[in-house]
Amino acid sequence: DICTNCCAGTKGCNTTSANGAFICEGQSDPKKPKACPLNCDPHIAYA
């Protein structure tokens, strides 16, 4: 399992659940990372 959340995901990269449902797009710019909580969103299976 991966451990990520919408905030920590990379901008432009979508996260999906185990059945392929779209959850969110990442919000963190690799050049200017956001300060994100390190919690795992249990719904996110792929990023």
Curated annotation (Swiss-Prot):
For this protein, the record's Gene3D superfamilies field holds: 3.30.60.30
A biological process (GO) of this protein is:
defense response to fungus
Q: Where is this site: Reactive bond for chymotrypsin?
A: 38-39
User: What molecular function does GO assign, one term?
Assistant: serine-type endopeptidase inhibitor activity
Disulfide topology:
3-40, 6-24, 7-36
The record's keywords, sorted A to Z, are: Antibiotic, Antimicrobial, Disulfide bond, Fungicide, Protease inhibitor, Repeat, Serine protease inhibitor
Q: Which SUPFAM superfamilies match?
A: Plant proteinase inhibitors (SSF100897)
In terms of InterPro entries, this protein maps to: Prot_inh_I20 (IPR003465), Protease_inhibitor_I20 (IPR051391)
PANTHER family in the cross-refs? PROTEINASE INHIBITOR TYPE-2 P303.51, SERINE-TYPE ENDOPEPTIDASE INHIBITOR
Give the family this protein belongs to, as stated in its UniProt record.
Answer: Belongs to the protease inhibitor I20 (potato type II proteinase inhibitor) family.
Function of the molecule: Inhibitor of serine proteases chymotrypsin, papain and trypsin. Has strong antifungal activity against C.albicans and R.solani. Has antibacterial activity against the Gram-positive bacterium C.michiganense, but lacks antibacterial activity against the Gram-positive bacterium S.aureus. Lacks hemolytic activity against human erythrocytes.
- Descriptive protein name: Potamin-1
Organism expressing this protein natively: Solanum tuberosum (Potato)
